[in-house]
Amino acid sequence: MPRRRVIGQRKILPDPKFGSELLAKFVNILMVDGKKSTAEAIVYTALETLAQRSGKGHLEAFEVALDNVRPTVEVKSRRVGGSTYQVPVEVRPVRRNALAMRWIVEAARKRGDKSMALRLANELSDAAENKGTAVKKREDVHRMADANKAFAHYRW
């Protein structure tokens, strides 16, 4: 960790088709082995399918799905006097987006549909309707934080 100065976060270029930085980040999270064009093709196909199903715009439908998966609180381990407590802490906005996107991609990869684009479209549409694996993950994290509310005073 540098002591002299805080290094700023690298600026991410917006995605070429929709001009959205959030979508560009999503493509980067989905990308495997540096194959960005493949990841972009998968995301754009999935968004096309999602837009047809929901009747909303591509970005709007994506934003709704992402909104339903974003966590507000999570638990972090904190060691106090020989025992470890799961302390609920609020999630920073950047991490909220990152976790939501990661959970959607993980859930889509575990699905059994034919193509990745179809799996991603199905997971996004499930997330938009407040169901599916990614939303369940968020609810589990929230439940965990709620169960450990008693240790909130150990926050740092």
UniProtKB/Swiss-Prot annotation:
InterPro entries linked: Ribosomal_uS7, Ribosomal_uS7_bac/org-type, Ribosomal_uS7_CS, Ribosomal_uS7_dom, Ribosomal_uS7_dom_sf
Q: Which GO terms describe its molecular function?
A: rRNA binding; structural constituent of ribosome; tRNA binding
Top-level taxon: Bacteria
Please give the GO cellular component terms listed in this UniProt entry: small ribosomal subunit
Q: Which family does it belong to?
A: Belongs to the universal ribosomal protein uS7 family.
Q: Name the NCBIfam families on file.
A: rpsG_bact
What's the protein here called? Small ribosomal subunit protein uS7
Name its species.
Sodalis glossinidius (strain morsitans)
Originating gene: rpsG
